[in-house]
From Swiss-Prot:
PANTHER family: BIFUNCTIONAL DTTP/UTP PYROPHOSPHATASE/METHYLTRANSFERASE PROTEIN-RELATED (PTHR43213), BIFUNCTIONAL DTTP_UTP PYROPHOSPHATASE_METHYLTRANSFERASE PROTEIN-RELATED (PTHR43213:SF5). GO terms for biological process: nucleotide metabolic process. This is dTTP/UTP pyrophosphatase. The keyword Cytoplasm applies. It comes from Clostridium kluyveri (strain ATCC 8527 / DSM 555 / NBRC 12016 / NCIMB 10680 / K1). The lineage of its organism: Bacteria, Bacillati, Bacillota, Clostridia, Eubacteriales.
Length: 192
């Protein structure tokens, strides 16, 4: 059985390679803007993950595939912080996160094309940022690390210096909660 990761993320690819040696990457064309946040963080990220997995399933001609979709988002005071559109939005995101706790949710959807079965779940991690002054934020943004990252920071990179505390799965904040994924795949009978 072929394992397929429905993601363009190099971070997810690196993390998945810790669990599975041989897998294929197929980038999803799912329109993330088609999913509207309706107040439930876990539902939102699971719908996004499922949309990505379904899109890739439709592209595959090989029927014996298991497709993994994942999406990660940052939530602060009930609002979604996705990937910043530009440097100004990234600045405002980091300014809002400064000195505050926020939640990082990842949704995972695994689709078995043989059994026509989908399993979905989510992981929540709480992250507390230190106070960050404007100069520090601007210096960070010059590094370009904020691009393509929910909440405009990467905990695994320089953005990790902003993190004062973390409660929950570190890999969830990076973008692929390994423990949850391992348990989901094992529960579907995938030998890891």
């Amino acid at each position: 059985m072929k394992i397929v990761l429905a993601s363009a993320s190099s971070r997810r690819r690196q993390l998945l390679s810790r669990l599975i040696e041989n897998f294929q990457v197929v980038v999803s064309d799912f329109d993330e803007d088609s999913v509207v946040f309706q107040g439930r963080c876990e539902s939102y990220v699971m719908k996004l993950a499922e949309g990505k997995a379904k899109d890739v399933c439709r592209k595959l001609t090989n029927e014996s595939s298991i497709v993994i979709g994942c999406d990660t988002a940052v939530f602060l005071r009930g609002k979604v912080m996705g990937k910043p559109r530009d440097i100004q939005e990234a600045f405002h995101m980091l300014k809002a996160l400064s000195g505050n706790e926020h939640d990082v949710y990842s949704g995972i959807a695994i689709m078995d094309k043989v059994l026509h079965k989908t399993v979905k779940s989510f992981v929540r991690t709480t992250v507390k940022f230190s106070e960050i002054d404007d100069r520090c934020i601007k210096n960070y943004l010059k590094k370009g690390e904020y691009k393509d990252k929910a909440g405009a920071y990467g905990i695994q990179g320089y953005g990790g210096v902003f993190v004062k505390e973390i409660h929950g799965c570190y890999y969830n904040v990076v973008g692929l909660p390994l423990n949850k994924l391992y348990n989901m795949l094992s529960g579907m009978g995938v030998n890891l």
